Structure formats: C-alpha cells, structure tokens
Amino acid sequence: MSTDRACMLCGLVQSTAEFNRNGCPNCQSIFEEAGVSAVECTSPSFEGLVGMCKPSRSWVARWMSIDSYIPGMYAVKIDGRLPIEVTELLPHYKPRDGSQVD
C-alpha cells in the first residue's frame, strides 16, 4: 500500500511523512493562513503522474497551472475537496478532481 498523497491545491505528490514533516512546499503559507494542516489538504486518492524538472519551461506545467511551483511529481487528477477555510481564501480556485471544466 502506498503512503503517497497529493496536495489537493497544487497536485504535488509526496509521502505522508514528508507532508507531516514539512508541509507542502508550494502551498504551506496558504494552509497556515487558513489554519489547517497540510495533511488535511492532501488526498491518498489520485490519478496520473507528471514529472516536472523545469516547470517554468514546460507547456504541460502551464496546461496544469503548475508552472510556478517547485520541480517534482504532480498528480493529474486528485479525489477530495479542500477545507472551506482554504477555498474561501482563493477566489479563482479550480478543483483538481475533474469537477470543473474550463
């Protein structure tokens, strides 16, 4: 059984231990402002992985809206919903669960 989880905001995939220890390197400041833990904003249920070495130069990263994030592995689709405390801070938030079509 995998212990990997995906951040429901940016899609970064890390182990549960990494999220517990360091939070999400892309989104931690938002989670802290909302008063929630990084693990509350992650999901063990996700589909597809994309490896990003240079997100700022990748068309796939632009398409996934992750071109300003750190290099790493990102989930394409993530099951779950962010806590309302987080979504209220983000007026342009688009869920990564496939429920919103562009």
Curated annotation (Swiss-Prot):
SUPFAM superfamilies: RNA polymerase subunits. One of its GO terms (cellular component) is DSIF complex. It is found in: Nucleus; Chromosome, Centromere. It comes from the Eukaryota. Keywords: Centromere, Chromosome, Metal-binding, mRNA processing, Nucleus, Transcription, Zinc, Zinc-finger. GO terms for biological process: mRNA processing; regulation of DNA-templated transcription; transcription elongation-coupled chromatin remodeling. InterPro entries: RPABC4/Spt4, Spt4, Spt4/RpoE2_Znf, Spt4_sf. GO terms for molecular function: RNA polymerase II complex binding; zinc ion binding. Pfam families: Spt4 (PF06093). A zinc finger (C4-type) spans 7-27. CDD domains: Spt4. Component of the SPT4-SPT5 complex. Interacts with RNA polymerase II. The SPT4-SPT5 complex mediates both activation and inhibition of transcription elongation, and plays a role in pre-mRNA processing. This complex seems to be important for the stability of the RNA polymerase II elongation machinery on the chromatin template but not for the inherent ability of this machinery to translocate down the gene. Belongs to the SPT4 family. This is Transcription elongation factor SPT4.
